[in-house]
Swiss-Prot record:
Cofactor dependency: FAD
CC cofactor note: Binds 1 FAD per subunit.
Recorded effect of pH on activity: Optimum pH is 7.0 for the reduction of rubredoxin.
Subcellular location: Cytoplasm
Catalytic reactions of this protein: 2 reduced [rubredoxin] + NADP(+) + H(+) = 2 oxidized [rubredoxin] + NADPH; 2 reduced [rubredoxin] + NAD(+) + H(+) = 2 oxidized [rubredoxin] + NADH
Record function comment: Catalyzes the NADH-dependent reduction of rubredoxin (Rd), a small iron-containing redox protein. Can also reduce other electron carriers, including 2,6-dichlorophenol indophenol, benzyl viologen and menadione, but rubredoxin is the most efficient electron acceptor. Does not reduce ferredoxin. Shows comparable activity with NADPH and NADH as electron donors, but NADPH is probably the preferred physiological electron donor. Is probably part of an oxygen detoxification system that protects P.furiosus during exposure to oxygen.
Subunit-structure text: Monomer.
Record carries keyword Transcription: no
Temperature dependence: Thermostable.
Protein name as catalogued: NAD(P)H:rubredoxin oxidoreductase
GO molecular function, one term: nucleotide binding
UniProt lineage: Archaea, Methanobacteriati, Methanobacteriota, Thermococci, Thermococcales
Amino acid sequence: MKVVIVGNGPGGFELAKQLSQTYEVTVIDKEPVPYYSKPMLSHYIAGFIPRNRLFPYSLDWYRKRGIEIRLAEEAKLIDRGRKVVITEKGEVPYDTLVLATGARAREPQIKGKEYLLTLRTIFDADRIKESIENSGEAIIIGGGFIGLELAGNLAEAGYHVKLIHRGAMFLGLDEELSNMIKDMLEETGVKFFLNSELLEANEEGVLTNSGFIEGKVKICAIGIVPNVDLARRSGIHTGRGILIDDNFRTSAKDVYAIGDCAEYSGIIAGTAKAAMEQARVLADILKGEPRRYNFKFRSTVFKFGKLQIAIIGNTKGEGKWIEDNTKVFYENGKIIGAVVFNDIRKATKLEKEILDFYS
């Protein structure tokens, strides 16, 4: 069976790796470089790791695994009748097609948005790194995973960092946990502007409802927009993302979708960890070993500055501190969620316990 994967990000790469010993695999990606670690981009920008450390696998690795890798090649259309992906360089036939096209950065619809940088690719990271090294400072707009991680790492590296967030709380967490994150980042040197709405940008800074904030380098991290254009052009059903069922099947026969481009019952993965787990589950399905992915369960770990935090399961409602660094959330006497600071071993143990609730 010939499996074609469009996209070489965390989900697409992991799927290719999982299937390469079983099927003939081709990966198509519009970027000109092999797989790199997107979660480590902010660490590279801050100067904590060199650029080459972002690339764990060489092109030779793909060849040794028997994976055909077609880089700098954009998929333009899917001919579902002939089962062919049409690219700018030719046609690629498939038996099974997997769309792992990821997402792009959401841009605010404001005057002066051309003065804002975004972070999704290694080339975005290169531009940001060069800009901040020249200026020594950055304004970050957005208090999600990317914004907080970048702010913490840049501040830890000695840059002057201002973070603008339209709300007062972060990552869907409660006020107590949000304040802890804020306090820890403030100790690192991040200056916060909360409940601040971005209105306009120019070369000298940004205008918010709280006033004008000066800064030459402005990085916007206010969310993602799933890349659905290929699917939509090809007549595959889309909403915010490419619509899939609980086996990752799209509305087109023998076409699947995973990662940030895929939408299941209103849910979009949003993290590299989720995309990679979806890839592992889909690989088993395609090998004839059916397995279920729990779309409602979230688990992510990220690091900004000296702070490492794991967010697991449902963290809504009233939680209880069981240790200084661990807050858990219960339902009917069972743990349904947890937030763990600076202890990945404990987070892994709790994740297994919480997964039992969801299974």
